[in-house]
UniProtKB/Swiss-Prot annotation:
Low complexity: compositionally biased ranges: 135-150, 414-429
Main location: nucleus
Record region (Flexible linker): 288-316
Assembly: Interacts with TBX21 ('Tyr-530' phosphorylated form).
Motif YxKxHxxxRP mapped to chain: 344-353
UniProt-recorded name of the protein: Trans-acting T-cell-specific transcription factor GATA-3
Any single GO BP term: thymic T cell selection
Taxon lineage: Eukaryota, Metazoa, Chordata, Craniata, Vertebrata
Biased composition range(s): Basic residues: 364-377
Annotated source species: Homo sapiens
Length: 443
């Protein structure tokens, strides 16, 4: 068979599955693209010849005795998934991966791709499988290989999402593991609403992961790692007053609670006003006033109830033996005395003499003070004012009766010549001043 120099260029790039006549889907279940038809596959005898040709078309001795055994020894099974790089940064929600462009940038620096003009021998000992098919889209890769690492790590900030070509090399497997550990540093607690939204987007992307998609999205989107803006841009409500109404007036402090207070004198627990003694102890209003007026503690013995008028009917004065008085009093011994004897004893500290006793009760006419007299005069003048003025009902009725005979449409001179007395008498009105007096005052 005649061999040309152009054949090694495309033969060296094909997968062994192609050379053996097998469909590529049997080795790559995740990859669904194929650029070769079954009719174009070369025959096994042609493959045996082509494997013993170098890049310049010269025949070289075979390394293996059989081409089929050489194929088996040179190409390990494709189910070794540990050699396939699975970068953790391929997130399903990032639409900037465009079909073959995203993986194409990764494989540019990869030793898996062989140049058509390369001088490297075809019998290299690379453990990884050779890339013969064009790279699949990001969705098919995520559904086939990268599904374990696609959603197990939290999304990273946008600055770390840019594709790194070094992650796709076989020697950077350790660095990929280290990057996966560093991804845990960017774990941000998400609100409940954003968690639900993220889970919904993950479910939708997982459903679309099995099918190939090459839709191009020129506008990049950020992963849902950003928390709510209200929690970061605005201070908490506790710094502004504790509530949205914190900008208003502050609530007034509550009044002092009187629970637990007790008067140290009488033991009262309820009083309209709490007072304090000289030592700072609480006193009820009654004990506090008594201590303030008398300088001593209020006596705890309740005074005897005053007898009603029926019970005092037979009461007599212990000094003068009278039974009629305007006010009953008590002496130092507690005996009831009349008003006259009680006042006399209060003023002179001696009992009232019996010679001063009178049959009738003497009353006095209290003199009115000058202030009360002045108020009484003003009150009387105000009472007399409506009687003399023309605003009283009698004057108004007379005036209306005098106007009743005038027609409402007649213009009589009587209305103009006869003025209505609408002013008070001359005693309360001011008389007109003569112009001459004004000139005299000005001159």
């Amino acid at each position: 068979m005649e061999v040309t120099a152009d054949q090694p260029r495309w033969v060296s790039h094909h997968h062994p599955a192609v050379l053996n006549g097998q469909h590529p889907d049997t080795h790559h279940p995740g990859l669904s693209h194929s650029y070769m038809d079954a009719a174009q596959y070369p025959l096994p005898e042609e493959v045996d010849v082509l494997f013993n040709i170098d890049g310049q078309g010269n025949h070289v001795p075979p390394y293996y005795g059989n081409s089929v055994r050489a194929t088996v020894q040179r190409y390990p099974p494709t189910h070794h998934g540990s050699q396939v790089c699975r970068p953790p940064l391929l997130h399903g929600s990032l639409p900037w991966l465009d079909g073959g462009k995203a993986l194409g940038s990764h494989h540019t620096a990869s030793p898996w791709n062989l140049s058509p003009f390369s001088k490297t021998s075809i019998h290299h000992g690379s453990p990884g499988p050779l890339s013969v098919y064009p790279p699949a889209s990001s969705s098919s890769l995520s559904g086939g290989h990268a599904s374990p690492h696609l959603f197990t790590f939290p999304p990273t900030p946008p600055k770390d999402v840019s594709p790194d070509p070094s992650l796709s090399t076989p020697g950077s497997a350790g660095s990929a593991r280290q990057d996966e550990k560093e991804c845990l540093k960017y774990q941000v607690p998400l609100p409940d609403s954003m968690k639900l939204e993220s889970s919904h987007s993950r479910g939708s992307m997982t459903a679309l992961g099995g099918a190939s998609s090459s839709t191009h999205h020129p506008i990049t989107t950020y992963p849902p790692y950003v928390p709510e803006y209200s929690s970061g841009l605005f201070p908490p409500s506790s710094l502004l007053g504790g509530s949205p109404t914190g900008f208003g007036c502050k609530s007034r402090p509550k009044a002092r609670s009187s629970t637990g207070r007790e008067c140290v004198n009488c033991g009262a627990t309820s009083t309209p006003l709490w007072r304090r003694d000289g030592t700072g102890h609480y006193l009820c209003n009654a004990c506090g006033l008594y201590h303030k007026m008398n300088g001593q503690n209020r006596p705890l013995i309740k005074p005897k109830r005053r007898l009603s008028a029926a019970r005092r009917a037979g009461t007599s004065c212990a000094n003068c033996q009278t039974t009629t008085t305007t006010l009953w009093r008590r002496n130092a011994n507690g005996d009831p005395v009349c008003n006259a004897c009680g006042l006399y004893y209060k003023l002179h500290n001696i009992n009232r003499p019996l010679t001063m006793k009178k049959e009738g009760i003497q009353t006095r006419n209290r003199k009115m003070s000058s202030k009360s007299k002045k108020c009484k005069k003003v009150h009387d003048s105000l009472e007399d004012f409506p009687k003399n003025s023309s605003f009283n009902p009698a004057a108004l009725s007379r005036h209306m009766s005098s106007l009743s005979h005038i027609s409402p449409f007649s213009h009589s001179s009587h209305m103009l010549t006869t003025p209505t007395p609408m002013h008070p008498p001359s005693s309360l009105s001011f008389g007109p001043h003569h112009p001459s007096s004004m000139v005299t005052a000005m001159g």
